[in-house]
């Protein structure tokens, strides 16, 4: 159904709630086939506040308001007490407190209720909200937690990650923090908390729609394992000129790599492990202090950073909350911040002094594969560049290093070609 057809439909004047515990297919099984809704919100929840129960699942509906939420509301208990919301709550979640708060503040104007609510809420959040007496409209606002949106002939879409709607439109924009988005069949509007209209800054993703599909593979992880050689090639090739590392296409000035006293690498999860490999690469060539810090702890310590310190932050999505907050802290101490991210225009990319985009394409499997290997390849290039600028290696040595890096995709292809052999070995070993 197109947007034009949506405009001709009678919009239901009620909020129909469907939620369950389990997989998305379990939710689909309880949804009505004859439902004539023209807009909806949904969320797959990883439990933070409260257990895995039907009552704790999103959306949460309180009075006139239905809401989904990605993030953590740090002062939810204080809000429940201040606004006397406890009697309205049936779940154990911080999210339901937000729904109850917005409902409490709602006096007919959805945007005004959201303005008042976000002024009270502390923490990270991305809200999508329905108001019963404003059918056919979705309202959204965020702080820190990611949110992207688009509008096209097939409809208006909003999500935490653009892979959710890339099959419909490659153009998208990142919803700015503390801006209220209104979405209808007629389009998307955006305004700041003072009510001033803001024009969305659209970007276009540069990978094909099939990159977000299994494309004949049994699952995404095996597909993404096989995509590693191409991903590494896409990442390193534009950054090699005359067999030397070159970041001119990234607009990274050569001076950025000069006069570096020490390096701190900040990341979470798999990206932190890539950082550990990067530490070895850089430290072995430069012989300067290199530390790796987990982002969730970095901002709670007094960082030993000065104006000659380089801070490298690593995040596949570019929206990892702890890493983003660590970057914001680092920016107060040094202008030498560099991010290694996979998503163009992401928050971490925008707030770094310089950004090194990896070209892994979307990584949908939970277990990281190609995103990790392109991060390691990026560190290899950086180590080589830093060593050259610090005069720790010669041009000839640098070319030897780069030649080795260029061979890595071929080595991976050779390993992957032996997959049938590895499969047989695994079957023999698994019950040994």
Where are these regions (language model features)?
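Conserved short alpha-helical segments that host acidic/polar catalytic motifs at enzyme active sites
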Residues: 1-214, 218, 230-237, 241-261, ...
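Conserved short-loop catalytic and cofactor-binding motifs
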Residues: 86, 102, 266, 270, ...
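Glycine-rich phosphate-binding loops that contact phosphosugars or nucleotide phosphates
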Residues: 258-407
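Helix-enriched interaction subdomains in cytosolic or periplasmic regions
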Residues: 208-241, 375-379, 383-413
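A structured phosphate/pyrophosphate-recognition subdomain
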Residues: 409, 430-432
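Glycine-rich phosphate-binding "P-loop"
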Residues: 311, 413-414
């Amino acid at each position: 159904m197109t947007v034009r057809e949506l405009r001709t439909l009678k919009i239901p004047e009620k909020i129909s709630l469907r939620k369950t515990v389990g997989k998305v297919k379990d939710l689909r099984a309880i949804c009505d086939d004859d439902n004539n809704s023209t807009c909806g919100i949904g969320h797959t929840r990883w439990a933070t506040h409260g257990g895995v129960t039907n009552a704790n699942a999103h959306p949460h509906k309180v009075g006139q308001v239905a809401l989904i939420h990605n993030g953590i509301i740090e002062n939810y208990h204080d809000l429940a007490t201040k606004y006397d919301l406890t009697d309205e709550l049936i779940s154990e979640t911080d999210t339901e407190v937000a729904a109850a708060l917005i409902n409490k503040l709602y006096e007919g104007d959805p945007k005004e209720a959201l303005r008042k609510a976000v002024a009270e809420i502390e923490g990270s959040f991305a809200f999508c909200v329905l108001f019963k007496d404003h059918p056919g409209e979705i309202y959204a606002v965020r702080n820190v937690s990611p949110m992207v949106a688009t509008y096209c002939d097939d409809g208006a879409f909003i999500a935490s990650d653009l892979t959710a709607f890339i099959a419909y439109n490659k153009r998208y924009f990142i919803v700015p923090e503390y801006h209220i988005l209104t979405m209808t069949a007629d389009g998307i509007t955006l305004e700041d908390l003072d009510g001033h209209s803001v024009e969305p800054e659209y970007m276009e993703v540069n990978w094909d729609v099939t990159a977000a599909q299994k494309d004949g593979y049994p699952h995404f992880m095996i597909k993404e394992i096989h995509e590693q050689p191409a991903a590494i090639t896409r990442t390193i090739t534009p950054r090699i000129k005359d067999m030397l590392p070159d970041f001119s296409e990234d607009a990274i000035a050569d001076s950025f790599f000069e006069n570096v006293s020490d390096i701190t690498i900040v990341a979470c999860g798999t990206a932190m492990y890539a950082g550990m490999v990067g530490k070895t690469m850089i430290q072995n060539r430069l012989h300067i202090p290199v530390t790796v810090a987990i982002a969730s702890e970095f901002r709670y310590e007094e960082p030993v950073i000065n104006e000659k310190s380089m801070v490298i932050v690593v995040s596949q999505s570019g929206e990892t909350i702890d890493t983003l907050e660590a970057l914001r802290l680092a920016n107060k101490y040094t202008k030498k911040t560099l991010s290694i991210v996979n998503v163009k225009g992401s928050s971490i990319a925008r707030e770094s002094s310089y950004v090194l985009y990896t070209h892994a394409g979307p990584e949908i499997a939970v277990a990281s594969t190609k995103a990790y290997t392109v991060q390691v390849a990026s560190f290899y290039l950086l180590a080589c560049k830093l060593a050259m600028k610090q005069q720790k290696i010669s041009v000839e040595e640098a070319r030897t290093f780069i030649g080795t890096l260029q061979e890595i995709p071929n080595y991976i292809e050779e390993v992957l070609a032996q997959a049938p052999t590895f499969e047989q070995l695994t079957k023999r070993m698994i019950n040994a």
